[in-house]
């Protein structure tokens, strides 16, 4: 019948994994119909599951991947290929890196094969107005066609927005929102939806913690807000939570705590964009909700795969510029 029903998932996953151990950068060219099938079938599954996922430990949580496909394979080598471990990814699968297509196709294939053990949240780059600019559109156009990029957009518009692990760990891509008073507000967001320029959905994908801010502050991205430590503490107390787990910012060690360990930032793309010496990290949450971190060290040009660390400039990160550069900062 439809492409999605004719998917040979094992063949697709097998071809995507065949390049393990190859020279990084080797492409895997699936057929256009196979990719379309992955988008349509995963979209169905996303819509059949809640927009605010309720998950159970044990699981492994990963931050931004940004088209760094060979680093994604390293994460799975380290954490165990599905279904050996349960996974939650926090968004930003595409853009910036060279292999957004392989990255998103493997993730969607695993979602379809293991729908109750493998979860993907939406990042700010799973949005047409952003990935039109930062690489994914161009990669789709060069390797396939614009129509396929639009099929991905339809899929991304149905991704879940946030997850709560064992009623204690709140997970999203960006951060908190001044509009977020109850979890029911997230549950009421209707899909498919684009990411608006402001409001709850925008903030969950775009906001950032800032140690120098009390309450809410302006965000130098030109989108959403920053929030201080006491905003985190109040949110956790109000909702009887222990931890916020988010991604969205490159951090030197792959993970970084904020607000007395009440929030953690995860970033899973080592040597981000080839410009940074950051590590990538994955957070393992065990049955008792104890969190530990597995680190992918940055490759050092002179020392091979697991070289020494240099560092980021304090606070240094490539930021995504405003969605609309003419728009005044909030």
Curated annotation (Swiss-Prot):
The residues listed in the UniProt record as binding Mn(2+) 1, with positions renumbered to this chain, are 64, 66, 92
Could you say which cofactors this protein requires?
A: Fe cation; Mn(2+)
Impact of altering residue 50 to R?
Promotes SMP complex formation
Q: Where on the chain is Phosphotyrosine found, per UniProt?
A: 306
Residues found modified as N6-acetyllysine: 305
Q: How is its activity regulated?
A: The phosphatase activity of the PPP1R15A-PP1 complex toward EIF2S1 is specifically inhibited by Salubrinal, a drug that protects cells from endoplasmic reticulum stress.
Q: Which family does it belong to?
A: Belongs to the PPP phosphatase family. PP-1 subfamily.
Q: Which reaction does it catalyse?
A: O-phospho-L-seryl-[protein] + H2O = L-seryl-[protein] + phosphate; O-phospho-L-threonyl-[protein] + H2O = L-threonyl-[protein] + phosphate
Q: What GO terms in the biological process aspect are recorded for it?
A: branching morphogenesis of an epithelial tube; cell division; circadian regulation of gene expression; dephosphorylation; entrainment of circadian clock by photoperiod; glycogen metabolic process; lung development; negative regulation of transcription elongation by RNA polymerase II
Region called Disordered, residue ranges:
306-330
User: Where in the sequence is Phosphoserine found?
Assistant: 2, 22, 325
Protein EC:
3.1.3.16
Query: What is the name of the protein in this document?
Result: Serine/threonine-protein phosphatase PP1-alpha catalytic subunit
- Enumerate the residues binding Mn(2+) 2: 64, 92, 124, 173, 248
- Give the GO molecular function terms: cadherin binding involved in cell-cell adhesion; iron ion binding; phosphatase activity; phosphoprotein phosphatase activity; protein phosphatase 1 binding; protein serine/threonine phosphatase activity; ribonucleoprotein complex binding; RNA polymerase II CTD heptapeptide repeat S5 phosphatase activity
Residue numbers of Phosphothreonine PTMs = 320
Give me the Gene Ontology terms describing cellular component: adherens junction; cytoplasm; cytosol; dendritic spine; extracellular exosome; glutamatergic synapse; glycogen granule; nucleolus
Q: What is its main location?
A: cytoplasm
GN (gene name): PPP1CA
